[in-house]
Amino acid sequence: ASAAILAAWRRVETIDGIPQACRPASEDEGYQAQDALVAAMGEPVAGYKLGATSPGAQEIFSVDKPFVGTLFESSLLQNGATVAKGGVTLYAVEAEFVFRFSADIPARAEAYSVDEVMAATGQMMPAIEVPDTRLSEGPKAGIAQVLADDGLARYLVLGSPVEGWRDADLPEHPVAIRANGETVSEGSGANELGDPR
């Protein structure tokens, strides 16, 4: 599965699904294929993205919880960067809250609280995600293939770290995307399942 996705990734093309002989059939198999893709990429991992973080997105992906994709160092772009036409197959952008950890959060059986995670967070910055897919059907290919496709991850354009973000009311914080001076999309932090934290 990872070989098919990696080949399409490098050619910036889509495929009509992962070949049946190696197509993941469950979320676990999808994440295993994603891990194999990360290993095959041979690039340093910079972080992770969450997908399907709103009820509408969960409906599109036919899931009831967010999923994870991997971001590589080459995926991170600085404020003002551009992505060339032909650099992705999916022409979309999403406004994001990005959190950069300042301490490790080791795996454990018990879920971490928001306060525990925020205590391990050093910075928050606005960002624009430029997702991409190597699957011609995109989300309709099913969550197992989407996970194998790195959760539709590709680029993340990072803004500057925000001073005083811990004191901000992030759920109520307005968010807007503008193109050529026109607002094309707007919402708030609450669009992220009630709270982007």
Predicted features, each with a name:
Residues 1-194:
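Catalytic-core "active-site belt" of small-molecule-metabolizing enzymes
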Residues 197:
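Glycine-rich phosphate/ribose-binding loops and adjacent secondary-structure elements
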